[in-house]
Amino acid sequence: MNVFQMRDKLKDRLNHLDVKFSFNREDETLRISRIDNGKGVTVKINPIVAKYKSQKEKIVDEIVYYVEEAVEQMKGEALENTDNIQIMPVLRSPSFDKKDKNGNSFVIDAHTAETNIYYAVDLGKSYRLIDEAMLEELKLTKQQLKEMALFNVRKLENKYTTDEVKGNIFYFVNSNDGYDASRILNTSFLNEIQAQCEGEMLVAVPHQDVLIIADIRNKTGYDVMAHLTMEFFTKGLVPITSLSLGYDKGHFEPIFILGKNNKQKRDPNVIQRLEATRKQYENKDKK
């Protein structure tokens, strides 16, 4: 599967939409725009081709779903009902776009050196990032927006699964509601987990649909965490960061794991365990 074949596959899958397609050969991107108002999304083809090698049609299905939802929400600019809207925080990498395609600046708060906080209107199956113009339309201040978002993320359920690898405990939040990574902003939840930790607590948001928390009890745990975050980072539709963050009572500190325990890191039993964990989430997504 090459870039041009993937371009054609996506066009075939999206041909039922009332849109036009524009392919940029230099950037290897496909622009899908509504015919009625010209608004749309731009998809980078090359990363999809790379993921297709391991994920096959699953990654194509995800992209098609994302485009369909985005194009549907671009029918009109105005929010029809601002009385019952749900404001949520979403995490993005510092390299993520600061403006939309029309040049409108998104509302952004700094979080860590590896993460920024954006704000979104929840639309059920998707969400729409809030820009400065929409903030005025909502008649909210930035502080009010932030308070509403943090209040709402604290109301989310925090279901998680646990796994033990080489004596280290790993917690996985993967509800697939679009806000798994956002739960890193729930300080009360993180403090509850920290109270259970016997070693150093690390957290990671490799992509928007997972939050990983680790209780690192020995040196091998750092290598396991590094491998784990990289695995999730490369598989995520909206990647955030492959680095872990040290956590202590509301304070985050980005850390870079050098991988000194390379022999232990490459232990086949550890790798097999990590792959099984990742595939568990892939199978969950397919259901």
From Swiss-Prot:
SS bond list: none
InterPro entries reported in the protein's UniProt record: DUF1444
Protein family: Belongs to the UPF0354 family.
The protein's name in its UniProt record: UPF0354 protein SSP1020
Organism: Staphylococcus saprophyticus subsp. saprophyticus (strain ATCC 15305 / DSM 20229 / NCIMB 8711 / NCTC 7292 / S-41)
